Amino acid sequence: MAEAGTGFLEQLKSCIVWSWTYLWTVWFFIVLFLVYILRVPLKINDNLSTVSMFLNTLTPKFYVALTGTSSLISGLILIFEWWYFRKYGTSFIEQVSVSHLRPLLGGVDNNSSNNSNSSNGDSDSNRQSVSECKVWRNPLNLFRGAEYNRYTWVTGREPLTYYDMNLSAQDHQTFFTCDSDHLRPADAIMQKAWRERNPQARISAAHEALEINEIRSRVEVPLIASSTIWEIKLLPKCATAYILLAEEEATTIAEAEKLFKQALKAGDGCYRRSQQLQHHGSQYEAQHRRDTNVLVYIKRRLAMCARRLGRTREAVKMMRDLMKEFPLLSMFNIHENLLEALLELQAYADVQAVLAKYDDISLPKSATICYTAALLKARAVSDKFSPEAASRRGLSTAEMNAVEAIHRAVEFNPHVPKYLLEMKSLILPPEHILKRGDSEAIAYAFFHLAHWKRVEGALNLLHCTWEGTFRMIPYPLEKGHLFYPYPICTETADRELLPSFHEVSVYPKKELPFFILFTAGLCSFTAMLALLTHQFPELMGVFAKAMIDIFCSAEFRDWNCKSIFMRVEDELEIPPASQSQHFQN
């Protein structure tokens, strides 16, 4: 019964929509017929006579005031439309027309197949939008105590936003905690410490967790019925407490490395114990997964400490071993740390080997992947590249490949070239980035600018070719060339990730639509004419009559036609014979 009732309502709705679409002319004539029949009771003739008498008594000042009032209202609407466009990036009138008026006027297709297809398309686009606007952990993030806090001490500015630090707190709770933490006092304290907003409270909680592990517990072991001995047993160290102290309390990279080494000893022991018990139940499996994340994080940060302290080869070895030991943990993006370290060693063959593995169509892209591939191809031709020579003889195959790689990288993240070419000042990278956004561009350029400078001519090639990308994608928000359309949400997310003193790079730049500019000019011109006509009616009448006489005069028409013909002749001018023979030779 319910399905029959629903089907009847759908049929009734479709009939009403069809009647509005095709029978509106019949309805219009019916209304006119009713008005004609009821003209005597409604006194339509008398009302029309009254209206005509009222219009005949109006003075020109009324029309001037009416024009000024309409211009004022149009100006207010224009201001509101401009504000709405600046804030939300779309026209309010257009949005209301498409979202609300179009369905009421029958602009929605009722075919079930079309609806299903459109819903599938919308879900795909929404899914793509969500994946594009996902915030990722920065694989090259700095140390809070040794780097971010030192910047704050020197400049007095906060390089991290609250939103960024809140995301880091959520990551720490996901990676470093599990449901069984309440069974161990130190882990229970650290579970609360990761939720603390105050840095000093977090550091104090980490020290408290380490102090609990120093308490010695006595275990009574009966040997015989008449005697016992006491065994002194130390509780295992808390690895996550050392991680927090290394990240936030250590003021130098050397101190952080020392604390991470202590964390490695504790974390390795916990990992081995949980590895043996992981098959005993879901609780032990979750604990082993947590211990695995802790161990991988510690080893990765130790490799980054070695990279910061100049031991680059040691850092590369640690990263390679870590990727071999845990090949499935791609959430940390260790290969991007490896690429940066290999570029520092100028081991370009090894960089190409890593790119061959990770620059795959099925894997998610990043600015590091795309721009490193462009750097390697630019390195082969950049030292001999000259824009003048290329314009004369054309691009060679290698140069064309390099230019295409640069265009591919710029399409993925168009903000990076401004930082590599030092057209925009760099800041400390955030702890989280948005792929294809300004935050990712800052994180990439902060570490890779030196590698581009080291390759002779690479920045020159980038400077000459990167803007050509935008000619291939005139509407980047609607259609891309090699990637999906550029996501709309990057500006909003980057403003939350980057500090307020940084000017966020916006792509594509929002330009006011032509109808807003045209409406602004028309309203301003009309209001000015109304004001001048109200103040100087006789003078404006003479001016209007003179302008009409000028436009209607024969001299004006002849001059306009001559100017048009002269311009066409200039455009179609044929070069002299000598010059044509020179080009033929």
UniProtKB/Swiss-Prot annotation:
Entry's localization field: Membrane
Transmembrane segments: 15-35, 62-82, 512-532
CDD domains cross-referenced by the UniProt entry: ST7
Phosphoserine modification, residue list: 386
Key words, A-Z: Glycoprotein, Membrane, Phosphoprotein, Transmembrane, Transmembrane helix
Gene Ontology CC: membrane
Topology with respect to the bilayer: Multi-pass membrane protein
Residues listed as glycosylation sites in the UniProt record: 47
Primary location: membrane
Pfam family, one: ST7
InterPro entries: ST7
Family listed: Belongs to the ST7 family.
UniProt-recorded name of the protein: Suppressor of tumorigenicity 7 protein
